Amino acid sequence: MSYRKIDASGVLKSIDWPTVLIYLLMVIAGVISIYAASYDFDEAGMLDFSEFSGKQALWIALSFGLGFIILLIDSRMFETYAYPIYILILILLFITPFVAPDIKGSKSWIVLGPMSLQPAEFAKFATALALAKLFSGYNFVLTAKWSNLARAGLIICLPIILILLQKETGSALTFMALFFVLYREGISGLLLFGAVFAVVIFVVAIKFTETAIMGIPTGQFWILVGVMAVMVVMLFIYNKRFNVLRNVVGWFALSAAVMWVLTLCGVQVPGMVVMLSVIGIAAVYLAFEALKGHAYKLFVPALTPVIAITFMFSVNMAFDYLQPHQQLRIKVVLGIEEDLRGAGYNVNQSKIAIGSGGLLGKGFLNGTQTKLKYVPEQHTDFIFCTIGEEEGFWGAMIVLGLYVALILRVIVIAERQHSTFGRVYAYCVASYFIFHFCINIGMVIGLCPVIGIPLPFFSYGGTALSIQLAEMGIVLSVSRQMKPTKAR
């Protein structure tokens, strides 16, 4: 394949300047926020290289150089070398636990003299390239056959497994954002619903375990009720014969009535056995109807309870796999335990800082919670609380607005691509940003457990910043292949 020769003047003329402007505003605001978060009264200036803000500014300068080099490279070259890059990063991920030092129970950082690198960040970049390369294959259609879906899932899951071996759960979860890309490329929304339903099952099964209904832990009881409700809703969607829906609803209603009467009569009902039997009989009936009438869509409501109930019983096993401090953080977020001086300390102090900022904030460098170091990690994962305290509600809204604008701009670039590679890659980057943005803000305000997800362009970190700029550099590179907008 021959590649286009690209000169610097051509890059400056064809670059997507609105996206560049938004990005510049964010990285500049990020350096200022890091300076504010790490500032003390005896500290040197913002650009002093001995301080976090100065180091971040140096990383920005180096990253801009890297980004400009990327812009000078024909984007088709990234498509050509996507798989080799992906394989090299997988090898690096495999090696990392054997050479990385143990830092807070995780072996995910490779130390090279004064510099530390996190291969998981490079894996995000490489996985996006590999996924885009797969989709750009000749006549590749994700939904055409199951093997295509399996290949896409394998590309996403391999780095997840290797990163989990490093005990770096937060970084591994980031790759789940790529399933939004699969949805954009034609996968059924049923799988996204399944992912949301799995999260609901996980939360309910863990949170409601202290009490019981009919001898069943309260969480599991309501999950089973929810499974029956989902089966009925799916029958509305996938079933064209009213008698099947009527029979299933009637079976559920009759079973509930019998159980209620027996309970009133003082009969000890083995609740779990009965409910599993009721759901199981309904699932077998639907499978029989699917085979008898060649209505294969009925297999969806027939198999859904099997998968959901299996996952419900495996929740405790999955929860036990987590590190003790991760379990405690989840319990604190769900309100199972209160530990304001331990696992819940960061989040509690963060919420105090944001709440004290009010509408307009306390002013630049005038924060009390942040300046007195009440919030740990405030220059990395919890940097948003510095913004909320010093700049207030309006400052926080401006930052959120910049994120929304950048994500929408990347999506626009994706939708206007001539090439499948460019479209899928841009959507991968947008999905990463959405995940980081939502989870980090959720962590800071107590809606999500603290899992070490930084805020892109704002949190301190050279590796993450360099990879984010490289990702944006390729997005800007492929943006030169955008379809022209139609004149109105």
Task: Annotate each PLM feature.
Residues M1-K13:
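Short, Lys/Arg-rich, polar N-terminal cytosolic tail immediately upstream
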Residues S2-Y3, M482-R488:
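Short, charged juxtamembrane terminal tails flanking transmembrane helices
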Residues V11-L12, N148-L149, L372-V375, Q417-H418:
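Helix-boundary and loop/linker segments of multi-pass membrane transporters
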Residues I22-L25, I32-S33, D42, M46-R341, ...:
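Hydrophobic alpha-helical transmembrane segments of multi-pass inner membrane proteins, especially
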Residues I28, A229-M234, G446-K483:
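Transmembrane alpha-helices of multi-pass inner-membrane enzymes
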Residues E168-L173, K362-G367, Q378-T380, I451, ...:
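Transmembrane helix boundary and interhelical junction motifs in multipass membrane proteins
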Residues R329-I383, E391-G395:
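TM-adjacent membrane-interface loops and short helices in multi-pass inner/ER membrane proteins
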Residues C385, A396, Y427-C428, P456, ...:
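Pore-lining and gate-forming transmembrane alpha-helices of multi-pass membrane transport proteins
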